[in-house]
Amino acid sequence: MAAKEVVFGNDARVKMLAGVNILANAVKVTLGPKGRNVVLDKSFGSPLITKDGVSVAKEIELEDKFENMGAQMVKEVASKANDAAGDGTTTATVLAQAIVTEGLKAVAAGMNPMDLKRGIDKAVIAAVAELKALSQPCADSKAIAQVATISANSDESIGEIIATAMEKVGKEGVITVEEGQALENELDVVEGMQFDRGYLSPYFINKPETGSVELDHPFVLLVDKKISNIRELLPILEGLAKTGKPLLIVAEDVEGEALATLVVNNMRGIVKVAAVKAPGFGDRRKAMLQDVAILTGGTVIAEEIGLELEKATLEDLGTAKRVVITKDNTTIIDGNGEQAQIEARVSQIKQQIEESTSDYDKEKLQERMAKLAGGVAVIKVGAATEVEMKEKKARVEDALHATRAAVEEGVVPGGGVALVRVASKIAELEVLNEDQKHGVVIALRAMEAPLRQIATNAGEEASVVANTVKNGSGNFGYNAGNDTYGDMLEMGILDPTKVTRCALQFAASIAGLMITTEAMVAEIPQNSAPDMGGMGGMGGMGGMM
């Protein structure tokens, strides 16, 4: 085991603070509407230009082991805020730096670190309760657009496209962000349930101009096995021929004689039919077939639950208003399932999402829930260059997370105002001793830090702006975008409550640990052995006689 270096007391804290400051100073320049860019070097390709706090934090590794520990702990604050709320990473970093700086000064002055931490924790618990009281629901699409605009660094086009997407697919719907081909942002919305399986034979196509199959008011047959024998399908096909309605077959596979017979019947116009493979694999396929069954009001024909295809009747089939099948996708629009059953299925999937530990499973469950609840929207980000595209895509993703957080827990006045108002309400918090009281004061001072940083980045004097805002009341605050004061809600400057809450809680949690640090242990870097010297040249051969 390699030898370790141990640093104690004030020496340890000074090193740690140096690391905290290097990382936080690089991140905090991005805060607010007039935040600056940070350029990140990439080992290949062009550098990345970003205003996203967590992207900057993730790039930073310091040479000094002890300073690096401080930087990594603040990086953890940014990552945690990003994971929980998807935004607020820069705010969390600014708060953490403010608490650590003031806290370590107090420890150096001889105060008890544990009491300081208790004071900070009490202040944060009280602040979170006040934030919830200050919060307002974010229901209409105007508020959603404002939240998204603020999170996307005041880009209104991003705010509007996210608000439109949310309106179209609902709060449970899935919105994905992709790189587009054009210069402008585009929005594609798929209503109904879509899965990535196309027609099994091009002979099913009945709309040659679009190369797709369109079925109006079809029956939907769902089978959890391969169909290769046409005899199994005959009872259903005979019943269908009498109704004159089309049929969509969703099965593990349709092959051989069964597929050939379906194609011939379709081409002769005896029955209008199309077949597709069931989406997914294994257990996920069973679950997705059940989703389609609930959406269309049908039953999955599966031998493991005692249902045989030969004995299936028209009562076992689902129905929908319309089905569109392309080479790659099948979309079922307006399934005729019962709303109560669909809602029960959605809440069941929600429960599974909460219990799941795998990010991949969560994502797939989220997709299934969206397909049942509303639909899927794809935002295609447009830009002139690849560098701009990456930067813009990161901002759209941030804005999307912020919007979801706003819908979940509501909104508070933005621009750092919410924390300033909360701080003034909890200033008289009761504590046990003077050191704890100082801990509360540290937390209250830190809550002004985001507002001060926004003002600094906008080129204003932070103390003047902070005092003006503190002397105001309610939603009165500073709009750094156009350098004016006024009602933040009326000016459309909103922050999601969840983002502000998570930033404060994670910053205080990790800053509290750093204040109570008394020793740091790191490996002593090994000096690599010197290279071998070059070998001497070989003597020339003597002249030959």
Swiss-Prot record:
One of its GO terms (biological process) is protein refolding. Its EC number is 5.6.1.7. The keyword Transcription regulation does not apply. InterPro entries: Chaperonin_Cpn60_CS (IPR018370), Cpn60/GroEL (IPR001844), Cpn60/GroEL/TCP-1 (IPR002423), GroEL-like_apical_dom_sf (IPR027409), GROEL-like_equatorial_sf (IPR027413), TCP-1-like_intermed_sf (IPR027410). GO terms for cellular component: cytoplasm. One of its GO terms (molecular function) is unfolded protein binding. It is found in: Cytoplasm. PROSITE patterns: CHAPERONINS_CPN60 (PS00296). It comes from the Bacteria. ATP binds at T30, L31, G32, P33, K51, D87, G88, T89, T90, T91, G415, D495. Keywords: ATP-binding, Chaperone, Cytoplasm, Isomerase, Nucleotide-binding. It catalyses: ATP + H2O + a folded polypeptide = ADP + phosphate + an unfolded polypeptide. Forms a cylinder of 14 subunits composed of two heptameric rings stacked back-to-back. Interacts with the co-chaperonin GroES. Together with its co-chaperonin GroES, plays an essential role in assisting protein folding. The GroEL-GroES system forms a nano-cage that allows encapsulation of the non-native substrate proteins and provides a physical environment optimized to promote and accelerate protein folding. Belongs to the chaperonin (HSP60) family. HAMAP family: CH60. This is Chaperonin GroEL. It comes from Shewanella putrefaciens (strain CN-32 / ATCC BAA-453). The lineage of its organism: Bacteria, Pseudomonadati, Pseudomonadota, Gammaproteobacteria, Alteromonadales. The gene is groEL.
